[in-house]
From Swiss-Prot:
Axoneme-binding protein that plays a role in the regulation of ciliary motility and cilium length. The conserved TPR domains are dispensable for ciliary targeting. The N-terminal half is important for cilary localization and/or binding to the axoneme. Keywords: Cell projection, Cilium, Cytoplasm, Cytoskeleton, Flagellum, Repeat, TPR repeat. One of its GO terms (cellular component) is axoneme. Detected in ependyma, trachea, lung, testis, and oviduct, but not in whole brain, liver, kidney, and spleen. Localizes on the epithelial cilia and sperm flagella (at protein level). Belongs to the CFAP70 family. This is Cilia- and flagella-associated protein 70. PROSITE patterns: TPR, TPR_REGION. Residues 392-448, 811-874 are annotated as: Disordered.
Amino acid sequence: MDQTSSTTKIVHITVTNGYDLKGFKGDTPVTFVRAEFNQTVLGDSSKVTVSPEGTAKYNFTSNIDLSPDGGGALDDLAHKPLFLTVTEVLPKEKKQKDEKTLILGQAVVDLLPLLEGEESFETTVPLHPVPGSPLETPLPGSKQCSLDVKVFVAEPLLTPAQVSASNLLKVTLEAAYSVPESFIPVGPQQNYMVGLQVPSVGEKDYTMIFKNGNLKLGGEKEPVPRPKKWPIANILAPGASNIPDEFIVGGPYEEEEGELNHPEDREFRNQAECTKKRIVWDLESRCFLHPFAVASFQKRIADCRLWPVEITRVPLVVMPKAKPGKLEKIDDENQLSFHGVAYINMVPLLYPGVKKIRGAFHVYPYLDGTVFEKTKCLFSLFRDTGHHLVQNNKAGGLNSPLSKPLSKNLKEEKPGKDKDTEGRPRLGELQAPSIKSQSSDTPLESEAPLSHNLEGQQYIEAGTYIVLEIQLEKALVPKRMPEELARRVKEMIPPRPPLTRRTGGAQKAVSDYHTQIKSISRAILNEYYRMFGKQGPKLESDIDNETMEERKCQLNYELNCSGKYFAFKEQLKHAVVKIVREKYLKTTAFESQEELQTFISELYVFLVDQMHVALNQAVPDDVPSSTSTIQTSSEQLRLFAFEAEVNEKFEIAAMYYEERLVREPQNLENWLDYGAFCLLTEDNIKAQECFRKALSLNESHVDSLLLCGVLAILLENYEQAEIFFEDATCLEPTNVIAWTLLGLFYEIQNNDIRMEMAFHEAFKQLQARTLQTKLKSTVTIENMEEGVKVEPSFGPWGVVQESTTAIKTEGLSGMRPQSSHQLSPHTNMELHPQPQGPNTALSSLDEFLEESPKAQSESQEPMATGQPLEPSLVQRSSNALLKELTSKKDISKCQDSSAFSPPTQHVIAQPPVTIFMETIRFLMKVNAVQFVHRVLAHELLCPQGGPSCEYYLVLAQTHLLKKDFAKTEEYLQQAAQMDYLNPNVWGVKGHLYFLSGNHAEAKECYERTISFVVDASEMHFIFLRLGHIYLEEKEYENAKRTYMHACKRSPSCLTWLGLGIACYRLEELTEAEDALSEANALNNCNAEVWAYLALVCLKVGRQLEAEQAYKYTIKLKLKDQALLEEIHTVQEMVGFGNPSF
């Protein structure tokens, strides 16, 4: 017994009670229960009489003996259920020797919990009636018949470590749709079969066979949800064939992982699944994977990404000696027919956290060469093994392991062995002569041509596809949990503690000073009343100065003698100290006496001014008129900083960004903008600090996470970069940019599988968003003006615009200003010349572009137009795209077939947006130019991307940043050839000529840009620079009109200054003064503004204001010597304005 217990594990199954039973011959029949497992009868219970209430107490126990190694026995528990058949024993009739029995129903017990580490479980399973059973009509008020079952083992079948390392594979075959028309339900009956192989431990593979598919005519869709069925034949009760709590639920096509999940496939699939013939299985087969089998399974996926799933049909005939109605298959006289194969991409199962693949897969004719090329599989499951492997297998489903693996890598084959280690003949020798394999150990170049599988070719003609689901209990590659990622981010970037409510602060210090001043003034006033009476102040106007001086002396004497003056000073001392510390931030000793005296003078002036403010508040009758101050907003400061960037005044730009941070340190957008500025100046360390501070303010801010990841890559902190990117995808799974950046990171790490996973998810999310956008924009497009076609487009600097190519014949005067235009401070960042940029960042990309074919862009006429391409987001890896450049021919064909539209509309075909171009826009917006060249290479090779107008625009921007004007002009020429009427092309061209000093060409480009109906991505600097050119060429009316548009759209000191200059040159001095006053209010440190204010004041004869403006002009060191000479000339003409006269 000890030896037996150590070598055999026993599963005990006890049937305790039956409920709501009734029989053929009455409501109290005599019944017994038979237990069966794996085609073996485990035993029968004793005969029990059912009570009038329908209850039977069986208390019947049966056992399943398992081998010590588990092996096939454990796998049997996974995919074979326990059958409990309840049979009624009829009373003996006269002259009857044996008892007659009739089956009432059958119950199914799923033993899968034993493989999950459980030692015991109890369940109540329904008893499904067999056809004709009285259980089909339950008693009134009773429930469905059921059995109570207890399952237990003395010790767990698997240790916790084995449970953790093992896995369970479930394969569900739903149906094959749009099958060939030659499949007809009449005539000889056919057995429709599908099979695949699963790697197991050692040298053996398991085969999964799905048999007896049900051929149906079209007419309606298969219902969902519908139950999954056991892949087992000869189940007596129809209801027992359904797997408990397992259903086929379907889902949107776009969420599938197969081949027919694109928008263009929707119509075909709807038609195929509603109106066309189909073969339905709805079977689920399981396979228990031991820890070693899990490793083998994972390795096979990595080695052979595509797995073959074969489909065929075999005729069934009625055998002469068989029982009536029993079908058997002829062994040798009929070949396989309609032998096809579907290729299942199993790679997604190696993605982190992925446990399921479900999708529709095309069926192709089975050809040895093609199958081997795609799957490295040498043998056909059906053809090379013979029909007998599936012929009489009543249990069906997962068969025993074959004697030799059916799908092996070529390098694993060992030719020359006629038998395997167990002495069994080779698989090729087992097959029937009529279906003998045409393949052999010879090279596959001699395989039969396509014409030898004409039946399989019908699958392609009919568009046949199978719907299959492959599911694992546990993911092969664990995925980090969001909680773990959030914890890791917190460890790297601790959240900023909330600011404590400070009782001090500069404003509070000044307020306390005002309070003390008011208190002391009241005390002094009370002392004055005590000495001279309350009527004194009313008669103050009648008192002469001598009397007033005498009273002041008496009051001072009294305050000093009484000690009140000293008390007032002590009362005020603490408030003054707080102002020094909080307002002036002085907490340490001064380095020199001169510095101390300077500070005391400044402090004295401030205290006196604030004393006057407090006294004026205390005496309302004497409140003077206050001068209103203009407080610039955060958006204005960002615009000013942006202007300084473009003009290469980086110190001034940094000052504006820092001012925004001082004003709103808790606003993460301010930190992101400053970080983007640091990226522009290539200060990566400070940029990282800014992005991390933004992330500390909001740990769930996706853009901050992405930018931290980008900086981590640039600084080669790859482990941190992965944490940031993964956390971003967890927080916002629909973010296309997050998935794309994660894929680019994995590409840097040479992790091809995860790279494909990330790009695949990005494609999927972009496809779903494109469909939603298309539905929302349909009505809008229909309501547009005739002759104007609007396409959603992104400008090259990341600002979303409505891009139309219809051109307006009116000039600038006919433009419709958009007063509600919101300006982004980083929408034109590529126009900022970098002071020091890497000269080799794009060299490899430039070389690659030089070798790329240019015939496509050169063949397009400037006004050529075509139909917009629908986004066909093929789910494939970027690495695979590099190997499939031949697919670019499809793009060329689409472009070559583009028709020319009527010349009155000028509609340009817009290419579909790709995940890479969307990522490029994000990176350009934040000035991450160092990372852009890698994404541009992907965009060039992407089937939905390739050379496009926006692609060449981005290239032009990157070279414009380096002041590589020759390359910039070359790429702008390419962009203009692809979209001649794109306003962004002309805008960047204008910037190119402006920066290179060719103002005549720049003027022409800017004028063309502003003549379009829809603006370019960034109009602010187009107006500024065009106005500047007009001023240079003394076209003051055009300059005035241009600057007025700029002031309406996005007012700044420079726009008002330009307007003021134009008005001054037109002798419109009042308008000039107003414009210059606006400019001065926005920035009172601009020397040019003070210079023109001085000129205006000189012209209108205001000497004091002229001198004051001239002083500030000199103090701020005006650099325009010509303007300074003009001021001197006017000063000499009018005779005033220069204090040195």
